[in-house]
Amino acid sequence: MIMGIDPGTLVSGYAIILVEQRYKIRAHSYGAIRLSSKDSLTQRYKQLFQTLSGVLDNVTPDAVVLETQYVHKNPQSAIKLGMGRGVLVLAAALRDIPVFEYTPNVAKRAVVGKGNASKQQVQLMVSKILNIPDVLNSDCEDIADAFALAICHAHTSAYTCLGVR
C-alpha cells in the first residue's frame, strides 16, 4: 500500500493505492483534509497532524509519498507550506513509515506522460487509470495529485524493492 499526499496549508489531498502487480494498481481510499483559513496556523498544523494520524492509525501504508517543496515567489508561503509538510512527515515517521518525495513534474510524467501536464489532465488520467470518476470534480485536484504521487512511487524501483511486483 502506498499513500500519496499533496500537502497544502488549507487543503491537503491524500490517496492510498494497492499495488497487486507492478502495473496493476487499485484505489484503496482517498480524501482531503480541509482546514479553515480562520484558524491560526498552529491550529491548522495541529488539525492536519491529528487528521492524518487518524488515517494512518486505520491504514498502515508501506510508504508515504509527498510532493517536494518548491521555491515559492512568496518566502512566507514556502515556510508555511514547509511547516505543514513537516507535520505530515512527522505523522508518518512516528509510525516508522518511510517517506519519499517526488517533484510535481515527475509525478505528472508518471501519470500523464508529460511533466507540464495541467491539473485537469492529471485528474483525467488518474480517473481512467483507477476508474474513479469522482476525481474529475473540481474540488478533487489535490486528491488527484496525491494519487499521481502514489502511482509515481509504485512505478519506481524503490517500491518494487519492497517485494511488490
Swiss-Prot record:
Source organism, top-level taxon: Bacteria
Cofactor mode of binding and number, as noted? Binds 2 Mg(2+) ion per subunit.
Q: Which InterPro entries match?
A: RNaseH-like_sf, RNaseH_sf, X-over_junc_endoDNase_Mg_BS, X-over_junc_endoDNase_RuvC
Q: What is its EC number?
A: 3.1.21.10
A Gene Ontology cellular component where this protein is annotated is: Holliday junction resolvase complex
Q: How does it assemble?
A: Homodimer which binds Holliday junction (HJ) DNA. The HJ becomes 2-fold symmetrical on binding to RuvC with unstacked arms; it has a different conformation from HJ DNA in complex with RuvA. In the full resolvosome a probable DNA-RuvA(4)-RuvB(12)-RuvC(2) complex forms which resolves the HJ.
Q: Which family does it belong to?
A: Belongs to the RuvC family.
Protein name (Swiss-Prot/TrEMBL)? Crossover junction endodeoxyribonuclease RuvC
Organism of derivation = Chlamydia abortus (strain DSM 27085 / S26/3) (Chlamydophila abortus)
Which taxonomic lineage does the organism of this UniProt entry have?
Bacteria, Pseudomonadati, Chlamydiota, Chlamydiia, Chlamydiales
This protein's gene is called ruvC
